[in-house]
């Protein structure tokens, strides 16, 4: 209730909402009820969320459920202690996840297409980012290698056997990341012209809802200007266990486009998987996370091999 106390006066001042009851949904989001019984969704956010929603509104995006405008005609209310927005509360009940996932992909496509603009890849800004990623990956792979060596030096048991058996997929991911990074850097050096757009950056299924028979995107607080591959990589990882033909979905999507998009998509998927493997020391790793992650990497190689491309 502390956060609601901070914004409670502003709910009255900027929205004429007199709070009578609430239900926490997350640490920053609440379902609230006013004195008339009407329900709202209130979420604490960052101050720059205002500019994001205003940008999308000005671009004419109609597949977004925007927050309610306050009395200053702004989507986000900002004060020295907190920034927040208010939306009508929509009770979205989804029985089958697969159709909803497909609808979200459609709405992400719509978002990217309507905010798209051309920009050349810039070696000056991209090189430091990839050098940082390379250093992080090198450190992570070194820690994993040391950990596996420590496991091999001990007697086999029910814990160590599946870890050792699945380590090959980590090595496969390492080789693939090097190969993809080489290709991405080639695109950067060539200063390829790439479509940038507004990416949702948190494309979880609960961030699309069905309202009056149409699907809308919500919770774009983390959105930013970037390459669509980021949204698709995060979407795939969030939903990889659904019964969807991801192989054909993404091959068909990237077919005919600059190979950079598909390379970057695959690079990000593997990067996120490897980042999951938190090696606390040479002696310990969470076996359950290791097995599930390496199984995901194995599935990656089934879904996302090169198509009509020469292996490098």
Task: Describe the role of every protein-language-model region.
Residues 1-18, 47, 168, 175, ...:
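Regulatory N- and C-terminal appendages and interdomain linkers associated
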Residues 5-35, 70:
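ATP-binding glycine-rich phosphate-binding loop
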């Amino acid at each position: 209730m502390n956060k609601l106390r901070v914004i409670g006066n502003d709910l009255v001042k900027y929205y004429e909402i007199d709070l009578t009851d609430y239900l926490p949904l997350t640490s920053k989001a609440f379902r609230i009820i006013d004195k008339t019984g009407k329900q709202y969704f209130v979420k604490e956010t960052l101050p720059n969320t205002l500019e994001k929603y205003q940008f999308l509104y000005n671009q004419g995006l109609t597949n977004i459920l925007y927050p309610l405008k306050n009395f200053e005609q702004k989507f986000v209310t900002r004060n020295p202690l907190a920034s927040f927005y208010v939306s009508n509360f929509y009770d979205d009940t989804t029985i089958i996840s697969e159709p909803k996932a497909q609808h979200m992909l459609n709405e992400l496509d719509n978002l990217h297409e309507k905010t798209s603009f051309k920009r050349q890849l810039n070696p000056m800004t991209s090189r430091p980012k990839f050098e940082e990623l390379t250093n992080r990956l090198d450190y992570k792979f070194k820690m994993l290698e040391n950990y596996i060596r420590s496991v091999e030096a001990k007697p086999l048991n029910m814990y160590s056997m599946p870890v050792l058996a699945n380590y090959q997929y980590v090595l496969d991911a390492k080789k693939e990341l090097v190969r993809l990074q080489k290709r991405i850097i080639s695109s950067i050096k060539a200063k390829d012209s790439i479509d940038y757009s507004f990416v949702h950056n948190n494309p979880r299924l609960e961030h699309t809802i069905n309202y009056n028979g149409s699907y809308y995107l919500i919770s774009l607080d983390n959105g930013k200007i970037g390459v669509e591959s980021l949204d698709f990589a995060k979407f795939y990882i969030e939903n990889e266990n659904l019964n969807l033909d991801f192989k054909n979905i993404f091959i068909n999507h990237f077919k005919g486009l600059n190979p950079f998009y598909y390379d970057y998509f695959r690079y990000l998927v593997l990067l996120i998987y490897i980042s999951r493997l938190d090696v606390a020391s040479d002696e310990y790793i969470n076996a359950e996370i290791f097995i599930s992650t390496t199984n995901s990497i194995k599935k990656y190689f089934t879904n996302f091999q090169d198509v009509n491309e020469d292996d490098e």
